[in-house]
Amino acid sequence: MKFRALGLVLLLAVETCKAEEITCEETKPFTCNQTDRFNRKHFDDDFIFEGGKGRGLNVWDGFTHRYPEKGGPDLGNGDSTCGSYEHWQKDIDVMTELGVDGYRFSLAWSRIAPRESNQAGVKYYNDLIDGLLAKNITPFVTLFHWDLPQVLQDEYEGFLNHEIIDDFKDYANLCFKIFGDRVKKWITINQLYTVPTRGYAMGTDAPEPYIVAHNQLLAHAKVVHLYRKKYKPKQRGQIGVVMITRWFVPYDSTQANIDATERNKEFFLGWFMEPLTKGKYPDIMRKLVGRRLPKFNKKEAKLVKGSYDFLGINYYQTQYVYAIPANPPNRLTVLNDSLSAFSYENKDGPIGPWFNADSYYHPRGILNVLEHFKTKYGNPLVYITENGELLILSGCNVKGYFAWCLGDNYELWPSRSFHVSPFYLLHRKDKGAFPSFEA
């Protein structure tokens, strides 16, 4: 079976911006002084690979300045990273040299809005999009990669509040209107699972979890409905959403751990895929979570069901799963409501070679994920939107592949400052940039 190929690069706009002269206060809610503001010959021809000025503050600015210890051992933040805002033309030159023909990046909500359009931000993205298209590089544009404008967090607690749905729709409407004549691949939200769990359950990310996830799904669906009704007939683009995925295998062959593994698939993958394909949450989640899990009314269920033209799949790891008691020492949360826990090792050793921190390589897992989506969710059109190595499972509807990432960035996770790029741009600081030997 032949597949097609496109690019190599992904770089988050939110992570390449420099916040200007931020001053922050120890208040609740948090406030700041600027709140207002590979080888392609085996692939078909149309397969896709991807290998600030005027910006207001977002929740990551506030979070990392108020709690610098959560920025990793180097107390890092995103004030200055690999500088794509200033060096986007050089980035495009590098992509061209590498033969990339797809680039996935995110729009920084706080650079464009939230209350009125920011012309400096709009010009930057217009220039970037035009520059990509001039080099025959297809832009894949994400509307939200966790960088909520701080003003919306301060006003009504962001995704905890239903009001976010219409604000997100208004922001998306502005983006479709300004950029949609040239952008034909839109992603609403990156990794639906991440903000509810890491932001509202673990506390490692800038801010519940079930309410936040529910509002994310509704915000996503409303934006998709807007695009399909108002813009798609003329602009002829596609719109989807990105799922962070993992694969799960039983810790051992006991029935309890096999059952725990299946439950966990529903809590991790089904939590979002069941609403997107059936308009409801998985039955096992309804049973175990109970009243803490919101419900879609009939109108909402119809809106959410089928609200994607394609899915982005991010994959990095596979974990062993084992059962835990129904009444564990620590109270149940979104992270263990499935009555399961995770490990990278079982009695036979690690699940794969060590990568970094507590992560291990397990490339086979992405094949398992793709097969799962093929058999359980109707074989949707898929772009692998973050991954480090290309692996395709025959029969799965995979259209493109994006390696993470173009430049080493400020990683939104503890131990933030490590190299993640198979080809990386060295931290510039006016020194220019050049590819590493990995390219």
Swiss-Prot record:
A beta-D-glucoside binds at residues 145, 190-191, 316, 386, 404. Glycans are attached at residues 33, 336. Expressed specifically in stamens and petals. One of its GO terms (cellular component) is plastid. Its EC number is 3.2.1.147. Residues 1-19 form the signal peptide. GO terms for biological process: carbohydrate metabolic process. GO terms for molecular function: thioglucosidase activity. The active site is at residue 386. Gene3D superfamilies: Glycosidases. Belongs to the glycosyl hydrolase 1 family. This is Putative myrosinase 3. It comes from Arabidopsis thaliana (Mouse-ear cress). The lineage of its organism: Eukaryota, Viridiplantae, Streptophyta, Embryophyta, Tracheophyta.
